């Protein structure tokens, strides 16, 4: 019998007990929640908005559908999906982190996004929804923080309706070698400094850089989605592979 307490995983470059990672990730996002949107704009030079727009365009979401914005944070995707599904549809903004969920709720209500949005604190590995609930699931810059990614992908598959699709927007592996080296230098030297100056938290942004490097590359994540049951899985490299959008279907 396997001793669960001895199972390990990665927290950035650290090896930690699996049971500890969720709390460590929670601490990171409790710390950065209030500066999350500002830091996203600064870190990506605003390009994250284009990546998210492309995700929306690839989602195929239309009026009357039900969408799960998983690890939805401050609600960038939820705001757009809310308009697409209209009054007859529904968007569930789910996040494991209470601070991020609170920021998302406040932000969306302040811009008038109400009525067809629900907020749920949920763990991606054990989603609290019935089978075959959602037409579309998105997880944007969240999967790399999940302890058991395979379990989370199976959970997402379960709650998708037949014909539904999952879109995973996540940092990935640059496909141009000179860019990869420059990206490493930026991630490990510049990002922590920005985090220190703006959010007074260099360590959380050092974890961000490390977690990106430990995340599966494009083809590995594609295979993981297929192993979870998804079909017709493909991916798009964005900004030369700095970010990738994976899409898979449940048939």
From Swiss-Prot:
Lyase as UniProt keyword: no
Keyword terms: Cytoplasm, Menaquinone biosynthesis, Methyltransferase, S-adenosyl-L-methionine, Transferase, Ubiquinone biosynthesis
InterPro entries in alphabetical order: SAM-dependent_MTases_sf (IPR029063), UbiE/COQ5_MeTrFase (IPR004033), UbiE/COQ5_MeTrFase_CS (IPR023576)
Pfam families noted in UniProt: Ubie_methyltran (PF01209)
Gene3D superfamilies linked to this entry: Vaccinia Virus protein VP39
One GO CC term, this protein: cytoplasm
Reaction catalyzed: a 2-demethylmenaquinol + S-adenosyl-L-methionine = a menaquinol + S-adenosyl-L-homocysteine + H(+); a 2-methoxy-6-(all-trans-polyprenyl)benzene-1,4-diol + S-adenosyl-L-methionine = a 5-methoxy-2-methyl-3-(all-trans-polyprenyl)benzene-1,4-diol + S-adenosyl-L-homocysteine + H(+)
Superkingdom, taxonomy of origin: Bacteria
Gene Ontology biological process: aerobic respiration; menaquinone biosynthetic process; methylation; ubiquinone biosynthetic process
EC annotation from Swiss-Prot or TrEMBL: 2.1.1.163, 2.1.1.201
Enzyme class name: transferase
Protein name according to UniProt: Ubiquinone/menaquinone biosynthesis C-methyltransferase UbiE
Species of the source: Escherichia coli (strain K12)
Gene: ubiE
